[in-house]
Amino acid sequence: MEPVIPEGALSQSTKDFLAGVSGGVAQVLVGQPFDCVKVRLQSQSNVSPIYNNALDCVKKISKNEGLAAFYKGTVLPLLGIGFCVSIQFTTFEYCKRFFSRDGTPVTMPQYYVSGAISGLANSFLVGPVEHVRIRLQIQTGKNVLYHGPWDCIKKISSQYGLSGIMKGYNPTAAREAHGLGMYFLAYEALVKNTMAKHHLTDRSQTPGWKLCVFGAGAGYAMWLAAYPFDIVKSKIQTDGFLSKATYKNSWQCAKGIYTKAGLRGFYRGFVPVLVRAAPANAVTFYVYETVSQHIRHL
């Protein structure tokens, strides 16, 4: 069992929150270009696609829109996803402390449950943040509907209210719960295995490069489990509103994807996600663990 660190002026939850924000900001800066490619591939038509594959997508975006296009809509996720990741880690660490309150080690199923709870808590914020980001990412050319994240929020909320902003929430919640359950389970299993194998008494003794590898592995575990939900979410969040919507609900969307493209349709755009998963999640956990160690005695 890892030693209990006495709290200083800051509560443990506050420390988890600050470390999570740091990890989230790092994740956005590294992962945003990959996410842009993923969304373009996911949201394009199955009948007449604009991009043949991920590399073709990168080439066409670079040529037609410039390199800055890969960071479209970054301001909101930089703030929003940073906050989202802090919610993930704060909730997860709180659940870990709850499950180990009587001194017993946290079990693997409890790690999954803790991750799933953190995903549900996070989904209320990440849903609208990603909705706005996606609306901005799919805009091409000069005649755009939304001029930045705040303009996007204003226009959607004024026309369609809160339900418009929260469009695609159900598949987002499913993705976050199952995905983060697997995410934290994989990471903690790798850390625990290393600590036991090398007789480490504290996770701060784990080398930084291993934290990066474990973070990358956790990212793969999450996306392998959650990607089909993400496909449905992206389809709905790039769909029209109310009477202009192609899909009435998530189930109809999933059936439509399967009818047109089979199981392969649920993994469209998966290559840039796999490429992104390693660096984005490696840096997330490395920054989170590093900041946690630096502020643990505050």
Curated annotation (Swiss-Prot):
Membrane topology: Multi-pass membrane protein
Sequence intervals crossing the membrane: 17-37, 67-87, 112-132, 172-192, 212-232, 266-287
Domain of life: Eukaryota
InterPro entries: Mit_carrier, Mitochondrial_Carrier, Mitochondrial_sb/sol_carrier, Mt_carrier_dom_sf
Solcar repeat boundaries on the chain: 14-98, 106-193, 206-294
Record localization: Mitochondrion inner membrane
Protein keywords: Membrane, Mitochondrion, Mitochondrion inner membrane, Repeat, Transmembrane, Transmembrane helix, Transport
Protein's name according to its UniProt entry: Glutamate/glycine mitochondrial carrier ymc1
Chief subcellular location: mitochondrion
GO biological process, one term: glycine import into mitochondrion
GO molecular function, one term: glycine transmembrane transporter activity
GO cellular component terms attached to this protein's record: mitochondrial inner membrane; mitochondrion
Protein function: Acts as a glutamate and glycine mitochondrial transmembrane transporter.
Family: Belongs to the mitochondrial carrier (TC 2.A.29) family.
